[in-house]
Amino acid sequence: MLTFDEAAEGLYVAAKYSELTLDAIEMLQRELKVPNPVPREKIHSTICYSRVMVPYSVASGSFEVATSGHLEVWNHGSSPLLVLVLDSDYLRCRHQYARAIGATHDFQDYTPHITLSYNVGVLKYPKEKYPIRVVLDREYKEPLKLDWADDLK
């Protein structure tokens, strides 16, 4: 049973990817000449960003979670993000699992994605589909950090 303090601290869960997937993401960042690319060690997909702690069990195993994605630029605060939106039933399912056990979510919908840059400036990118084999290495969880953006500076 969680204590009140534990429940109040929130939960963050993310997917980390295989070395081959990270190689492919870095190659895509280079081919697209992405400014301010997310470094290899920080590439991930958020599964759960909950303001309450829930008893989430991380999945184990390494398997393909998506075979392609398309680019979108999202406005997030003062810097436009470049994301690779993934068509991933697995990531959607894991997010739904977190919600089913009581996790909160700050947005209307959950969109599985990998952030390629936290600041692409005024650049625009075509919304075409990019074939990319996205293989899960592991999931991890930690207490929620509301000031996570400070780590990007």
UniProtKB/Swiss-Prot annotation:
Positions that bind 3',3'-cUAMP: 12, 142, 148
Presence of the UniProt keyword Lipid metabolism in the record: no
Active site, per annotation: 44, 46, 113, 115
Signal peptide region: none
Pfam families assigned: Acb1
Binding site for 3',3'-cGAMP: 12, 142, 148
Keyword Lyase: no
Single GO MF annotation: hydrolase activity
InterPro entries the UniProt entry points to: Acb1-like_C, Cyclic_Pdiesterase
GO BP annotation list: symbiont-mediated suppression of host innate immune response
Catalytic activity: 3',3'-cUAMP + H2O = U[3'-5']pAp[3'] + H(+); 3',3',3'-c-tri-AMP + H2O = A[3'-5']pA[3'-5']pAp[3'] + H(+); 3',3',3'-cAAG + H2O = G[3'-5']pA[3'-5']pAp[3'] + H(+); 3',3',3'-cAAG + H2O = A[3'-5']pG[3'-5']pAp[3'] + H(+)
Annotated keywords: Host-virus interaction, Hydrolase, Inhibition of host innate immune response by virus, Viral immunoevasion
Function according to Swiss-Prot or TrEMBL: Counteracts the host CBASS antiviral defense system. Phosphodiesterase that enables metal-independent hydrolysis of the host cyclic di- and trinucleotide CBASS signals such as 3'3'-cGAMP, 3'3'cUA, and 3'3'3'-cAAA. Does not cleave cGG or cA4. Besides evasion of the CBASS system, might also enable evasion of the type III CRISPR systems that use cA3 signals.
Family, similarity comment: Belongs to the anti-CBASS protein Acb1 family.
UniProt protein name: Anti-CBASS protein Acb1
Organism this protein belongs to: Yersinia phage phiR1-RT
